[in-house]
Amino acid sequence: MAKQDYYEILGVSKTAEEREIKKAYKRLAMKYHPDRNQGDKEAETKFKEIKEAYEVLTDSQKRAAYDQYGHAAFEQGGMGGGGFGGGADFSDIFGDVFGDIFGGGRGRQRAARGADLRYNMELTLEEAVRGVTKEIRIPTLEECDVCHGSGAKPGTQPQTCPTCHGSGQVQMRQGFFAVQQTCPHCQGRGTLIKDPCNKCHGHGRVERSKTLSVKIPAGVDTGDRIRLAGEGEAGEHGAPAGDLYVQVQVKQHPIFEREGNNLYCEVPINFAMAALGGEIEVPTLDGRVKLKVPGETQTGKLFRMRGKGVKSVRGGAQGDLLCRVVVETPVGLNEKQKQLLQELQESFGGPTGEHNSPRSKSFFDGVKKFFDDLTR
C-alpha cells in the first residue's frame, strides 16, 4: 500500500517552515499519543506515521532527499550509494519536542506520578467566615507497605529488562535510519518484576481509605480550592504522589447573603418606626448590635455596618454588613388601631396626601397627566 505524503500527515504545506512543522507535530502527537489512546491500534499507527514524518521534515538533509525522491529516498538502495549511511543514529531526533510534551522522550520512562484527587466539602457560612478544621475520609491508592512501592516480593528486586537492557528504549530500523521507541517488553521502565508482591500483585500500590485533618482558612467562599500536596494517590513504583484538592461549597444561610466580602440581610420594621425613627437590634455573625433608624426611612434603604462582613482569605480589609430595611404593612388591626390610622390618613389630606407622601403625589400627578394627554 502506498505511503501517505509526509506533508499531508502533518497537515502542512511543502513550503512550511520548521516552526510550523514543529507546531503541527506537537498538536498531533498530543492527540494520538498511546498514553492517551490505550488499546487503540489505529491511533498507535497514526502516532508512528506522525513521528516518522516529523523525523524527516525537520532534518534539512532528509527533507531535501524526500522532496527530490519521495519515500524511495529511505528505502534500502533507494538512493544508491549516495544516501546518509546505514550506520547513522538518529536516537535524539525527538528530544526537544517530544520531551517537552511528555516529560522526556529519551532514556528510561519515568514511573507515573500519582493521580490528583478531589473532595467536595460543604461548609456553613459561619465555618467559611471564621475558618474551621475538619476531618475527612477518602478512598485512595497508597504505597504498598509490604514491598514499599517496588512491586517486587520482599527479598527480591526488579530485574533489568533483557530487551532494552535497562534503557527503556529499543532501536527500530527504517531503511537507512534508526529511530528509538518505548520498549514494548517493560513499557519503558527498564525493569521487569519476576516475583511480584503478593499483596499488591506487582503494582506497588493498594486501595485504602485514609483520614485527613483539613484546616480551612477564614474567608473561603464557594468555588475556592485548598491544595494538600502529596495527599493524592501514590505514584507508581515509588514515583511522587499526587495532590488532594478540597473544593469548597458554602451552604445557603437563612439570614445572610454573601457577595464577595460583604454580607447582606433584610431587616423588617413597622411603619411607625420608619416614620418616626428609633433604635433596633440587627443580627451579625458576632451577635446582635444596635442600629439607629432615622425618621422618614423608606423601604429599600441600606445601612452599612463597617467591618461586620467577611475577612478576605487573601488578606486586605474586612467586608461590611449591609442591612436593607423593609417597611411592613400592619396586619390583624383591631378597631381602635383602624380608627387611629383613619384619623392619621385624614390628617395627611386623604390617600394621596401631597405634603406627607411626596412619592405618592408624584406618582398620581404622573397618572393624571397620562390620562389628560390621552383625551386631548
Curated annotation (Swiss-Prot):
Any idea which positions bind Zn(2+) 2?
C161, C164, C183, C186
UniProt cross-references to Gene3D superfamilies, sorted A to Z: DnaJ domain (1.10.287.110), Heat shock protein DnaJ, cysteine-rich domain (2.10.230.10), Urease metallochaperone UreE, N-terminal domain (2.60.260.20)
| Zinc fingers (CR-type) by residue | 131-209
Q: Where does Zn(2+) 1 bind?
A: C144, C147, C197, C200
Keyword tags: Chaperone, Cytoplasm, DNA replication, Metal-binding, Repeat, Stress response, Zinc, Zinc-finger
The question of whether Zinc is a record keyword is answered with: yes
Primary localization class, coarse: cytoplasm
Cofactors demanded by this protein:
Zn(2+)
Q: Which PROSITE patterns match?
A: DNAJ_1 (PS00636), DNAJ_2 (PS50076), ZF_CR (PS51188)
InterPro entries assigned: DnaJ, DnaJ_C, DnaJ_domain, DnaJ_domain_CS, HSP40/DnaJ_pept-bd, HSP_DnaJ_Cys-rich_dom, HSP_DnaJ_Cys-rich_dom_sf, J_dom_sf
Extent of the CXXCXGXG motif repeats: 144-151, 161-168, 183-190, 197-204
Cofactor: binding details: Binds 2 Zn(2+) ions per monomer.
The subunit structure is: Homodimer.
Its domain description in UniProt is:
The J domain is necessary and sufficient to stimulate DnaK ATPase activity. Zinc center 1 plays an important role in the autonomous, DnaK-independent chaperone activity of DnaJ. Zinc center 2 is essential for interaction with DnaK and for DnaJ activity.
What does the protein in this record do?
A: Participates actively in the response to hyperosmotic and heat shock by preventing the aggregation of stress-denatured proteins and by disaggregating proteins, also in an autonomous, DnaK-independent fashion. Unfolded proteins bind initially to DnaJ; upon interaction with the DnaJ-bound protein, DnaK hydrolyzes its bound ATP, resulting in the formation of a stable complex. GrpE releases ADP from DnaK; ATP binding to DnaK triggers the release of the substrate protein, thus completing the reaction cycle.
Q: What is this protein called?
A: Chaperone protein DnaJ
